[in-house]
Amino acid sequence: MSGLRQLATPRPVAVRTGASGVPLALERTRVEAVAEDWVVDDRWWTDSPLRRRYFELVLTNGRNAVVFHDLVDGRWYAQRA
């Protein structure tokens, strides 16, 4: 199918956060700014709910990244880095 794009599979990533839970560094690269953040809360009615806090980050190396904190298992993942 043309025009469709496959979503990037999330991969585990090391994130250092501040006291409020906002990312300060992704792997070894510092975060310059948080462009946007949002929460996805889905499948709450099932045995495997999905609850994630997403962050679109601007890194000090000039790249953008989208990461999320899985609020169910406590781990961090990169959706786009």
Where would I find each of the regions flagged by the language model?
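Non-catalytic peripheral regions of nucleotide-handling enzymes
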Residues: M1-A81
